[in-house]
């Protein structure tokens, strides 16, 4: 078996190859690689990329959250101790046991909605047994004794 004959004419002339490459560079067909970026800082900060907002096919939570504290849950019951009665008579103040999660604004709104009375201010404290007590001071145009009568404390 003799080795396969290589066609000598198929090999390109080096001079012709160089001329062809020079012509391509001049015409702009060959794109140069971008120059390497010179880093001057020691630390590398990852560049911010585009964050596309999520478009879920369905919500993660199927039921909408309901309000856990409505007005009836905020005010548990009025306090009818001797000291509470003294507050009603002397300071125009009603005393309630309220939900531990209720804040002063929620207590004020609950009293306004349930008893149709304006409150001047609300003071709260947490009792040693873990319940929250609210002192609801009424405005001068409301009498705490009449409101207590209407509620059924007295």
Swiss-Prot record:
Annotated function: Binds to a specific region on the 26S rRNA.
Protein family (similarity comment): Belongs to the universal ribosomal protein uL23 family.
Protein name, per record: Large ribosomal subunit protein uL23y
GO biological process, one term: translation
Source organism per UniProt: Arabidopsis thaliana (Mouse-ear cress)
Bilayer-spanning residue ranges: none
Gene: RPL23AB
PROSITE patterns, sorted: RIBOSOMAL_L23 (PS00050)
Highest taxon listed in the record's lineage: Eukaryota
């Amino acid at each position: 078996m003799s080795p396969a004959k290589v066609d000598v004419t198929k090999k390109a002339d080096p001079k012709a190859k160089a001329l062809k490459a020079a012509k391509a560079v001049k015409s702009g067909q060959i794109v140069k690689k971008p120059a390497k970026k010179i880093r001057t800082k020691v630390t590398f900060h990852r560049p911010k990329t585009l964050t596309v907002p999520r478009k879920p096919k369905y919500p993660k939570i199927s039921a909408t959250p309901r309000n856990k504290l409505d007005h009836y849950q905020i005010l548990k019951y009025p306090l009818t101790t001797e000291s509470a009665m003294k507050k009603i008579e002397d300071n125009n103040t009603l005393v309630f046991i309220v939900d531990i999660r209720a804040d002063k604004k929620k207590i004020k709104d609950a009293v306004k909605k349930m008893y149709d009375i304006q409150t001047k201010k609300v003071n709260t404290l947490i009792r040693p047994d873990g319940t929250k007590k609210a002192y609801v001071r009424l405005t001068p145009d409301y009498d705490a004794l009449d409101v207590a009568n209407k509620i059924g404390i007295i």
